[in-house]
Amino acid sequence: VLNDVPLSARIFNEEPFGPVAAVRGFEKIEDAIAEANRLPFGLAGYAFTTSLKYAHLLAQRLEVGMLWINQAAAPAAELPFGGLKDSGYGSEGGSEAVEAHLNTRLVSIMNA
């Protein structure tokens, strides 16, 4: 887990794969959404909030194929798996895999 990482760091400008997370706080939800959508990648997103209003706003505005709010990823065979933008087109797993030309999103919100 990394914090106090400058925005110019590779982890904030590439799509990292591996056991690493760069944690960053934001004053305004709009700034967090803009930063999350800034790059051409959209595999998955994770957010932690006590606000159900913010959880729904993130679900509507984040450009990711899978969104996990207030929980770790919990993939299962019956759930869609896949990203948007340069992270993929369509999804694997679940009945959504049959509809390979759609951008299907998974949003899971656990009330905090």
Predicted regions and their residues:
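Conserved C-terminal structural/oligomerization subdomain of aldehyde/semialdehyde dehydrogenase
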Residues: V1-A112
